[in-house]
Amino acid sequence: MTPTLDTKYVFTITARIGDVVTAGETGIGVRRIIPIIGGEVTGAVTGKVLPFGADFQTIRPNELIDLEAKYAFETADGAIVYVENKGIRFGPVELLQELKRGEPVDPKLIYFRTVPRFETGHEKYRWLMEHIFVASAARHADRVVIDVHQVM
């Protein structure tokens, strides 16, 4: 028998976002680019989200949204951690349309899950590269809140 999969909450990334840029229909869906302009990291790791990077999204014809965010944060003790976070967001079409317009939607009604990967040269945070992480997220008008869990 293989090891049991358990997860443990480790930290939350709150990424503030800028205005959406749309590249239009690309043949596989509508391509959107959402700049990441700052934010914070709280929990077992603390720090600030650096004001660069973006979430590159493709909205499929069925409204399923493929997400691929690339950005970085700086820990409270000065380590730089690069983040690549891939995932999906899906839910009732009318609620997804409300989110696109920046209207509030109960996060429990939207399936928004990601698999973040981290890179850093700082020895103290090497463990971020030695484990698998999964996340549950919520989109708000001005930010995305990502609760990161370590797979044990």
UniProtKB/Swiss-Prot annotation:
Gene3D superfamilies: 2.40.160.20
InterPro entries per UniProt: UPF0311
PANTHER family, A to Z: UPF0311 PROTEIN BLR7842
UniProt record similarity statement: Belongs to the UPF0311 family.
Name of the molecule in the record: UPF0311 protein blr7842
Species for this entry: Bradyrhizobium diazoefficiens (strain JCM 10833 / BCRC 13528 / IAM 13628 / NBRC 14792 / USDA 110)
